[in-house]
């Protein structure tokens, strides 16, 4: 007998129920993307390694899945090189292609290749799997979907406003209460400027983030332990203790950052986004949060992050503004802003809060039990008509034992079962069983349709 | 400057318009799958090579994309092995994983791994890309989507009937006239039996298929040239000349195959499928076609193939009944029947016949022109309301030149544009331009919504 098959570690099969839930998530997000004028693209799973390498740092390069060249992959490699066993160096000889690591680099590559046919500003979304040779662990997979929306070729803050509205609408549709956190890279730059410690900005945000947990004294001690001079720590006090409404925070920052051009610009941008969003009436809480420091190497303006309020889990969505998407491919000045929805975490959140609508599962609504050839022949035209009316329906294909057929209906959570034997055929009717209530009734085909569609 | 980036040969980017069309195709098929009780699964892109190797013949093994092991892939390979440069043999040392080559083997693997949680008969569909290191050529790609529906764990011919109904409904929805060809492996076995030439069945079907083109004499000559004795060719005459309605063909076959148990079984199965399908009223032409010989190594009963009637192109869908899906993984007796829709060819057919409905493109319905901050601020609440009403709408994010903004509307084929300047703001109205007719009218926000939604 063949060995029992398995799947590579860090990968997953998605069963029908999981798929239905995932489709509900992606379709909901997709509808919002369309509502805001975003258009879908897809890029190949495989990219040339020359496109991928060097874009994610040394660590990222190691995590790329590389595809062995077809045919004689030893071609062009000397014996000496082979015996050197230099896995990193020879990878580029054995392999010309790799699996995409994220959606951003392929998007940048796409924009450069298709620049002449794209009408900018280009609002694109992309929902595709990515692959990373990470050590698999709970909640971290080697293959997972990313779900990104970006608009490139526009510096307007209206794009940031729209993205906040989109986040608000997506989670509103899901019924998940979220807090949308906003920061701005320029504010962080301003803070670094006024205290003269540009390279300590991450240490500072990490320390400030602990204020609630460890208190002001300990925050200041941590800052000192990171080598930040007392004078700078003194200047940081109003920022560490920043509180109140977004408006109050912004007013404080205007004073503190008065001498930093970048800082004031960041405050102004944040003010516009927060005011406009608030005027347009989003339902989620939107909060200026200076401790938000995701993607600092990459983001140049607004930074977003979304936290679920009723589930303990990391951020379920995030993004920001960047200045130069395509510079690595020799095309400068392509700024943009984007967000990414974390499908796996959203899946977990909706599961924990039990928020999947029943319709989302898209399953069979009506099963015809099969008692034999004659009964099946009686059912088939009715089944065909029922489907014609848009009802998802099936007949159990074999005349198996009743128990097995009802078990099938239960497993597939089919809400209605039609049963046809001698009596029903003689009367031109069917017995319709409501699987939820257990109720049974003798109905005509038209009545059956009315009940099931109700 | 960095080199201009490209993509691996045989792969494709899908632009927004292509994506919208592809989504229309997949969503249409998906809806039909759901209507018939099929449920979606997804399997990982990467499978263990032990799962994939040996399933597609030697040629197929060569066409698998193999993924280089992470870390030190030289581990466990001796210097002698390296210097042997045996690319085929060492591939299994360098690589443990490969990209999926089709959806059937991963499905079989899935069924074996999840047998205890599946409620049989299991009606599953799967729409995912597959990868083959084929030589790229026109219409043949190294990455392409397959779209398969199978039901396993049931021998009932009602499954075959349903699949024909599904094919009929899918192409009916597309508006593509098709001919659904049906054959049965057992009929072909019967033919081989009565003439005593079991290994010549492919030669025979190929020769018969040429009847219309080259005439009976040449068909017989070709059969003789393939080493089929005259006596056998004589017996084949009624089969070569088989014509008339499906009923007439079946009657002839009953006589010709009278001494073959398998042959008669095949006739009986075909008769049931054709009669039942016809009684249920499919719209497509359904034809018994003995020259249909796809997947003869694999199919054991019914064989299907779908041809578009109004476009010159290969089959756009096909499938059949198989006896033992999971035997290669040590689980016997799992018979099933399935069909596969050829997405790329269907895409071409719908393009050639111009059959994409306008709604399929899902694009923006209304663009607000942006004349500046004040005008944008006036538009934003209206835009928000319009979206609230389900209209896909956007505002041009920058106050660019009118020409550029109108060009954007044209490129995205946006049917309505709202223009707001001083006058409109003073009157609390908007100028709405119908981009198809060129008509302009001054409307209130409510009137705008009514026109755009109409």
Swiss-Prot record, chains A, B:
Keywords recorded for this protein, A-Z: Aminoacyl-tRNA synthetase, ATP-binding, Cytoplasm, Ligase, Nucleotide-binding, Protein biosynthesis
Localization of this protein: Cytoplasm
GO cellular component, one term: cytoplasm
EC number annotated for this UniProt entry: 6.1.1.21
Keyword Nucleotide-binding: yes
Coiled coil: none
Pfam family, one: HGTP_anticodon
GO molecular function, one term: ATP binding
Catalyzed reaction equations: tRNA(His) + L-histidine + ATP = L-histidyl-tRNA(His) + AMP + diphosphate + H(+)
Subunit structure: Homodimer.
Name of the molecule in the record: Histidine--tRNA ligase
Lineage: Bacteria, Pseudomonadati, Bacteroidota, Bacteroidia, Bacteroidales
């Amino acid at each position: 007998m063949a060995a029992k098959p398995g799947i590579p570690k860090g990968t997953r099969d998605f069963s029908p129920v999981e798929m239905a839930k995932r489709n509900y998530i992606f379709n909901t997000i997709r509808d919002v993307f369309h509502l805001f004028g975003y258009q879908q693209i897809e890029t190949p799973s495989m990219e040339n390694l020359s496109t991928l390498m060097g874009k994610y740092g040394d660590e990222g390069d190691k995590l790329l899945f590389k595809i062995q060249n077809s045919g004689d992959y030893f071609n062009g490699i000397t014996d000496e090189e082979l015996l050197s066993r230099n896995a990193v160096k020879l990878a580029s000889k054995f392999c010309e292609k790799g699996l995409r690591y994220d959606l951003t680099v392929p998007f940048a590559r796409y924009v450069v290749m298709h620049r002449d046919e794209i009408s900018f500003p280009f609002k694109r979304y992309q929902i595709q799997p990515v692959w990373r040779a990470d050590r698999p662990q709970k909640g971290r997979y080697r293959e997972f979907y990313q779900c990104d929306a970006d608009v490139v070729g526009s510096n307007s803050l209206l794009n940031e406003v729209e993205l906040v509205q989109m986040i608000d609408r997506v989670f509103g549709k899901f019924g998940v209460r979220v807090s949308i956190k906003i920061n701005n890279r320029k504010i962080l730059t301003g803070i670094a400027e006024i205290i003269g410690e540009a390279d300590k900005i991450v240490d500072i945000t990490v320390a400030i983030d602990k204020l609630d947990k460890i208190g002001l004294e300990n925050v200041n001690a941590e800052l000192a332990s990171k080598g930040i001079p007392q004078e700078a720590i003194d200047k940081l006090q109003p920022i560490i203790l920043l509180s109140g409404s977004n408006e109050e925070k912004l007013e404080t920052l205007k004073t503190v950052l008065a001498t930093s051009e970048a800082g004031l610009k960041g405050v102004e941008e944040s003010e516009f986004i927060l005011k406009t969003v608030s005027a347009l009436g989003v339902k989620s809480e939107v909060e200026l949060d200076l401790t938000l420091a995701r993607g600092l190497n990459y983001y140049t303006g607004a930074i977003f992050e979304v936290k679920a309020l009723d589930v303990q889990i990391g951020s379920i969505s995030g993004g920001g503004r960047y200045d130069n998407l395509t510079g690595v491919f020799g095309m400068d000045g392509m700024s943009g802003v984007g967000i990414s929805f974390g499908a796996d975490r959203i899946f977990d959140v909706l599961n924990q809060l039990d928020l999947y609508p029943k319709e989302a599962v898209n399953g069979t609504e009506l099963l015809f039990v099969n008692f034999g050839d004659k009964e099946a022949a009686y059912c088939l035209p009715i089944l065909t008509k029922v489907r014609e009316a848009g009802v998802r329906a099936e007949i159990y294909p074999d005349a198996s034992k009743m128990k097995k057929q009802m078990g099938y209906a239960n497993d597939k959570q089919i809400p209605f079962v039609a049963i046809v034997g001698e009596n029903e055929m003689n009367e031109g009717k069917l017995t319709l069983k409501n699987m939820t209530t257990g109720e049974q009734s003798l109905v005509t085909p038209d009545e059956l349709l009315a009940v099931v569609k109700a």
